[in-house]
Amino acid sequence: MKVLLGLLLGYSVLILTHELPDLSATQHPPKEELAYWCTYVKNCDFCWDCQNDICKNKITNESISINSIVNCRVTRDSIHQWCFYEISVKMPNHHNMECSLPRPYTGNEIFMEKWGGGDYWPIIIRHCCFYLVFSIAFVGYIVFAYHKNLHLNTTMKLLALLSILIWLSQPGLNRPLSIFYMKQNLPRTYTPPVRELEYWCTYGKHCHFCWECRHGICKNKVWDDMPFIKQNDYISQCSIARYFDRCMYFIKPKTPYIHYMDCSQPTAYEGFSHS
């Protein structure tokens, strides 16, 4: 471990003091950079030496099953000091890292390549048209109030009424989980609202927020027919988000990935592959 930390520290100093050349997309990084690249995602194929279905890590000497190894490519942009992993399991995903340290790059922890293309443009156009009409109505109301010399109290009441109508129209624009759920977007969070657990846990039965664990034994909060499991088995850290009519899982086992779903029901979102 001390040797590994020393290598990482030395390589970090090397990167900080010497601008490394661009590294075009390649299956295997240079051997002298393995200690750096293999720190963040240890299950990349170039970090392991496999014989007889048993793989030994080239840096830490750990051993794992060959089934845990995934194919990876690496890239470096020396101008912006960004280093990239491209990991392909069932669905490719990308990791951005600061080249100076093997950790996720701030603001770009993970992003997905979109398949199908352009399928959410009708939603964006619908929103733009709606807010354009709202803006015209708002300006028209201000002009109307000015010419009619309406009292400030009356003006504020009518503005409040207009705002309420706009708020109530959001479910029609965003197709939420149900007609009773009025929130437009669900920001990325690690725990969904309790009332939505059944929805989110239909697909992500392995997400940690679907389980209640005591003394190392976990019971599913939603599905009574799910057998008890050990706390360290099967459960993964998950976070969720809702964007327009699209719902997303951010699942982080050894290799993070995103799963897209229709917000109306927990089924795969058309046009996106999922793991």
Curated annotation (Swiss-Prot):
Record's bilayer topology term: Multi-pass membrane protein
Location relative to the cell: Host membrane
InterPro entries tied to this protein: ASFV_fam_110 (IPR004848)
Pfam name, any one: v110
Record: glycosylation sites: 61
Cellular component terms (Gene Ontology): host cell membrane; membrane
Transmembrane segments: 5-25, 127-147, 149-169
Keyword tags: Glycoprotein, Host membrane, Membrane, Transmembrane, Transmembrane helix
Major localization class: host cell
Functional description taken from the UniProt entry: Plays a role in virus cell tropism, and may be required for efficient virus replication in macrophages.
Family as reported in the entry's similarity comment: Belongs to the asfivirus MGF 110 family.
Protein name, UniProt field: Protein MGF 110-11L
Species name: African swine fever virus (isolate Pig/Kenya/KEN-50/1950) (ASFV)
